[in-house]
Swiss-Prot record:
It comes from Methanothrix thermoacetophila (strain DSM 6194 / JCM 14653 / NBRC 101360 / PT) (Methanosaeta thermophila). PANTHER family: 40S RIBOSOMAL PROTEIN S8. Keywords: Ribonucleoprotein, Ribosomal protein. Part of the 30S ribosomal subunit. It comes from the Archaea. NCBIfam families: eS8. This is Small ribosomal subunit protein eS8. CDD domains: Ribosomal_S8e. GO terms for cellular component: ribonucleoprotein complex; ribosome. The gene is rps8e. InterPro entries: Ribosomal_eS8 (IPR001047), Ribosomal_eS8_CS (IPR018283), Ribosomal_protein_eS8_arc (IPR020919), Ribosomal_Se8/biogenesis_NSA2 (IPR022309).
Length: 127
């Protein structure tokens, strides 16, 4: 668990005396960092007793072709580009906005795998 509350330090470096302690709603979690590999999903209990699916590994993506409007389930080969973090490319980490290479060409990921539990992407036009 990761606490996402206010810092105990001022911008000058001096200490702030907190008026209250930490609260449960200020807790966050570590990112899922979805990898390319055999599918692995983890269920997380979220606020209100709801559930969120963490996609830890994925080997297929639901890729939509904007020209024809058809959607296919295709195999993910590798991560080509990731604007979230340049080091995610060599580590093969899939996030929203990442460009992945699939069997039918390159596609941009539109879903959030760590939140939604699926990889949805749109096919990019060939240069």
């Amino acid at each position: 668990m990761k606490w996402q509350g206010k810092s105990a330090r001022k911008p000058t470096g001096g200490r702030l005396v907190p008026a209250r302690g930490k609260r449960k709603y200020e807790l966050g979690r570590e990112p899922a960092e979805t990898l390319v590999g055999p599918i692995r999903v983890k269920k997380i209990r979220t606020r209100g007793g709801n559930q969120k699916l963490r996609l830890l590994k994925a080997d297929v993506a639901s890729v939509s072709d904007p020209v024809t409007g058809a959607t296919k389930l295709v195999k993910i080969e590798t991560v080509v580009d990731n604007p979230a973090n340049r080091h995610y490319v060599r580590r093969n980490i899939i996030t929203r906005g990442a460009v992945i290479r699939t069997e039918i060409g390159e596609a941009r990921v539109l879903s959030r795998p760590g939140q939604d539990g699926v990889v949805n992407a749109v096919l990019l036009p060939k240069h």
